[in-house]
């Protein structure tokens, strides 16, 4: 049972006639009703119409005719929805949030981005921080600058785990072991403080609640699941919004307010819930919540890149809602893994989901694709054909026969607006991750023969990376860890498991040597990574299958790609594999993101 006399910091007392809330219930900004052009503007809610309580003449005639006068009178007097509507009037939100949430009408400029330093101004030194990262797009939202700070007590929380794993067994047991070793090998961070959860599926929520301390801050990028997590906690532990003054004093709620938490918890939650939206940067100020006997702070999301593309610009708003609304994710893809087949062509045949990206396999390759991105997929003869079709869709106002496949706006109408990336050569499967969009699994089939590099074309400003298939990687690593009684690492140390891609010129024909050249330019001062610069990369990739001693020993994907110095100085790297990596010249995400 909650200690009701404990901190309800900031829930204002109110009556049905006077609204005294001072913050938007959705974005937590201070409300004002004087200047519509300034942030926080809202219109005062109107009272319920008298007609709700006093039926008009036509209503009375109908009631007389149906002989339900007495029943209708009782229904009006005891209508539980009437009280709900009155109470929801008290959940005041600003005009900006009202237009965005209820009418899907918003200007992205009214949702400004914040930097990490901006957000950390809200967090006192030495505070407990939960770094929220969506596991489904790991590692693109993982910020080592947060995890490495000495002035914060940071725990890594991986949300949306139900979009990666079939059940919570792996989430509760296997992920923490894997992440402990991943952080140690990759970031030199020795930490046991990792949780994988699913707020929608209620996976590990009780464990998470028992772990987090009083006065904890939730920190992460926009739309990573902070507000959804808070709402799950509020429902499970009967939590509510609070306000803390400058002295740290907690203002207790009125008995009337708290009584409703027990008499009508559903309505109580509607009033107290955090604002959840597919729109990024909705939260503009810190909002505190009382969850059981603990205070939890929801911080605004922050962005790590000033050149990041706002997805509202190129992507159709209906498609964007499907991408961002976690509850619409179809988990049957996790269980069934239904794939689509595609063969590479000499014309540059491509695979796309809405025009958001174009995947171009090399000529003659046979590929299987498992899509974890909402929306129908389509193949085209080449990228130019795809762009031409989608341009026609945008100009036809929805009458084009292929309009259902178009997920981009008319602003993306030329091939030059896409960046071309080369994917390192691989045997088996990889997952291609697009930040804030999702991921696809790409698998090559048949006998290995190097036919060229896979390519992916993406609108400029969208981050992309590849990884070994995450579920299989963690499952096999855990099995190895258990069988050896912890002597073998759950996270591979003989190879990086995530990689960045290389941008190519649109007209570049020799992509493999272009990758090598680019790598050498970026590692000019890294002598250990340039020991085999004179070897021909084509000779290597043509005979990968013959080098079984150096490739097939690598479990799962066997990425035959990466050529950077070992992740850590004590990594036990097979010399043949190490030599192969250095010859091919592929740069890793670890080097690009994690190393300063």
From Swiss-Prot:
<dbReference type="Pfam" id="PF01926">
    <property type="entry name" value="MMR_HSR1"/>
</dbReference>
<dbReference type="InterPro" id="IPR027417">
    <property type="entry name" value="P-loop_NTPase"/>
</dbReference>
<protein>
    <recommendedName>
        <fullName>Genetic interactor of prohibitins 3, mitochondrial</fullName>
    </recommendedName>
</protein>
<dbReference type="GO" id="GO:0005525">
    <property type="term" value="F:GTP binding"/>
</dbReference>
<dbReference type="InterPro" id="IPR030378">
    <property type="entry name" value="G_CP_dom"/>
</dbReference>
<dbReference type="GO" id="GO:0005739">
    <property type="term" value="C:mitochondrion"/>
</dbReference>
<keyword id="KW-0496">Mitochondrion</keyword>
<feature type="transit peptide" description="Mitochondrion">
    <location>
        <begin position="1"/>
        <end position="21"/>
    </location>
</feature>
<keyword id="KW-0809">Transit peptide</keyword>
<comment type="function">
    <text>Interacts genetically with prohibitins and thus may be involved in the mitochondrial lipid metabolism.</text>
</comment>
<dbReference type="InterPro" id="IPR006073">
    <property type="entry name" value="GTP-bd"/>
</dbReference>
<comment type="similarity">
    <text>Belongs to the TRAFAC class YlqF/YawG GTPase family. GEP3 subfamily.</text>
</comment>
<dbReference type="InterPro" id="IPR050896">
    <property type="entry name" value="Mito_lipid_metab_GTPase"/>
</dbReference>
<feature type="domain" description="CP-type G">
    <location>
        <begin position="113"/>
        <end position="305"/>
    </location>
</feature>
């Amino acid at each position: 049972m909650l200690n009701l006399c404990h901190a309800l910091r900031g829930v204002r007392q109110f009556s049905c006639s006077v609204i005294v809330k001072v913050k938007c219930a959705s974005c937590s900004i201070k409300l004002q009703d004087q200047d519509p052009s300034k942030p926080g503007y809202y219109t005062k809610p109107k009272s319920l119409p008298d007609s709700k309580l006093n039926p008009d003449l036509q209503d009375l005639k109908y009631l007389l005719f149906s002989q339900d006068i007495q029943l209708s009178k009782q229904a009006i007097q005891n209508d539980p929805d009437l009280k709900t509507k009155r109470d929801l009037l008290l959940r005041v939100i600003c005009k900006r949030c009202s237009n965005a949430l209820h009418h899907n009408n918003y200007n992205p400029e009214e949702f400004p981005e914040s930097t990490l330093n901006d957000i950390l101004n809200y967090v006192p030194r030495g505070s407990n921080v939960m770094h929220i990262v969506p596991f489904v797009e790991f590692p693109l939202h993982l910020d080592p600058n947060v995890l490495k700070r000495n002035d914060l007590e940071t725990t890594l929380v991986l949300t949306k785990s139900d979009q990666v794993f079939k059940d919570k067994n792996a989430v509760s047991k296997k992920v923490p072991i894997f992440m402990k070793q991943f952080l140690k090998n990759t970031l030199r961070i020795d930490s046991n403080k990792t949780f994988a959860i699913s707020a929608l599926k209620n996976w590990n929520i009780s464990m998470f609640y028992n772990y987090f301390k009083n006065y904890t801050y939730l920190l992460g990028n926009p739309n990573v699941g902070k507000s959804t997590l808070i709402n799950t906690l509020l429902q499970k532990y009967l939590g509510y919004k609070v306000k803390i003054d400058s002295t740290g004093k907690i203002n207790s709620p009125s008995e009337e307010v708290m009584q409703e938490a027990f008499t009508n918890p559903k309505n109580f939650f509607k009033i107290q819930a955090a604002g959840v939206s597919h729109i990024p940067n909705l939260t503009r100020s810190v909002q505190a919540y009382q969850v059981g006997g603990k205070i939890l702070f929801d911080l605004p999301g922050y962005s790590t890149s000033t050149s990041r593309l706002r997805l509202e610009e190129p992507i159709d708003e209906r498609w964007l809602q499907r991408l961002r609304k976690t509850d619409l994710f179809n988990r049957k893809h996790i269980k069934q893994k239904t794939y689509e087949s595609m063969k590479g062509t000499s014309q540059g045949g491509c695979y796309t989901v809405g025009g958001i990206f174009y995947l171009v396999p090399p000529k003659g390759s046979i590929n299987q694709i498992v899509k974890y991105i909402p929306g129908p997929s389509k193949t085209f003869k080449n990228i130019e054909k795809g762009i031409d079709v989608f341009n026609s869709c945008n100009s036809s106002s929805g009458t084009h026969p292929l309009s259902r496949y178009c997920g981009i706006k008319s602003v993306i109408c030329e091939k030059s607006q896409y960046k071309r990336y080369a994917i390192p050569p691989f045997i088996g499967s990889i997952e291609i991750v697009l930040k804030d969009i999702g991921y696809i699994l790409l698998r090559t089939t048949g006998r290995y023969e190097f036919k060229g590099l896979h390519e992916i074309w993406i609108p400029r400003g969208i981050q992309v990376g590849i990884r070994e298939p995450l579920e299989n990687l963690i499952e096999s690593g855990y099995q190895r860890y258990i069988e050896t009684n912890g002597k073998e690492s759950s996270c591979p140390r003989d190879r990086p498991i995530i990689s960045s891609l290389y941008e190519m010129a649109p007209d570049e024909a020799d992509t493999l040597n272009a990758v090598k050249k680019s790598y050498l330019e970026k590692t000019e001062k890294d002598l250990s990574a340039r020991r085999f610069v004179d070897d021909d990369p084509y000779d290597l990739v043509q005979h990968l299958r013959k080098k079984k001693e150096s490739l097939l020993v690598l479990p799962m994907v066997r990425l035959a790609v990466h050529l950077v110095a070992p992740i850590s100085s004590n990594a036990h790297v097979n010399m043949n594999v190490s030599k192969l990596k250095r010859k091919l010249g592929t740069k890793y995400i670890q080097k690009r993101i994690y190393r300063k």
